[in-house]
Amino acid sequence: MDITVNKANSLKGEIEIPADKSITHRAFMFSALTKGKCKITNYSKGADCLSTLKIIQQLGCEIEYINDKELIIDAKNALKAPIESLNCGNSGTTTRLISGILAGQNFTSNLFGDESLSKRPMKRVITPLEQMGAKFIHNDYKLPIEIKGTQLNGIDYISPLSSAQVKSCLLLAGLNANGTTSLNISNLCISSIASS
């Protein structure tokens, strides 16, 4: 199955999401990449998702809490260099997905996490991001890591494992890359994205 995503001229509307951790991480991150405001309803308030929310705030997004189920993320049109290191807490999803976004920015970011997260492997996203041109400083592919944002180039990546985090990371990176980024698993094209 081939899926190609091209940039739309305009995207408007409302989506009500279930209180799902995986969807919430991605909703927060995609909202951070928009030009304008996004309202998110019924988001997960788990610690991992709150780590993602805190990080996008540190990157310049403004968060307005409407009530206990709704918030608005105002991305202010562009991410900004963080003043402090970004704390991913215990969230591997936060670390891997935000790496895809940060790799294509025009600033340097530092990611760290708790003791448990600092033992978990990040090679599965660092390797393909480096193939796209990203620059990392790390200790054996583990946190803490420094990401030196740069202009990325699209790649055709054959993944040795099926991982939603790797797919999401590379598709997020592909949004800021020159050309087309394709992710293949077992020679089956799962996803591709072309930036403009």
Q: How does the language model describe each region?
A:
Residues M1-S196:
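Structural preference for solvent-exposed beta-strand-turn elements
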